[in-house]
UniProtKB/Swiss-Prot annotation:
Pfam families recorded: Conotoxin
Protein name: Conotoxin PnMKLT1-0121
Top-level taxonomic group: Eukaryota
Keyword Endoplasmic reticulum included in the entry's annotation: no
Cysteines engaged in disulfide bonds, as pairs: 52-67, 59-71, 66-75
Gene Ontology CC: extracellular region
Naturally occurring in which organism (per UniProt): Conus pennaceus
Membership in a protein family: Belongs to the conotoxin O1 superfamily.
Keywords: Cleavage on pair of basic residues, Disulfide bond, Knottin, Neurotoxin, Secreted, Signal, Toxin
Domain notes: The presence of a 'disulfide through disulfide knot' structurally defines this protein as a knottin. The cysteine framework is VI/VII (C-C-CC-C-C).
Annotated InterPro entries: Conotoxin
Extent of the signal sequence: 1-22
Length: 80
């Protein structure tokens, strides 16, 4: 009986935590799961998959996608 009550309280707590930490207040769980499914279908959309460009490689001036330093058509390391 005590274990059942503890399980019910744990499930209610986790559900409330999920709603409280959701990004969009209107579509809390729906929005969370749709973003996750989109990232699974398109791994390039994942924030963890962002690639950076090594030094002396061509880069994008607008996005500044160099690992270290700055992008001036090629990634260059700027001494501090």
């Amino acid at each position: 009986m005590k274990l059942t009550c503890m399980m019910i309280v744990a499930v209610l707590f986790l559900t409330a935590w999920t709603f409280a930490t959701a990004d969009d207040p209107r579509n809390r769980l729906e929005n969370f799961f749709s973003k996750t499914q989109h990232e699974m279908k398109n791994p390039e959309a994942s924030k963890l998959n962002k690639r950076c460009i090594a030094e002396s490689e061509p880069c994008n001036i607008i996005t500044q996608n160099c690992c270290d330093g700055k992008c001036l058509f090629f990634c260059i390391q700027i001494p501090e």
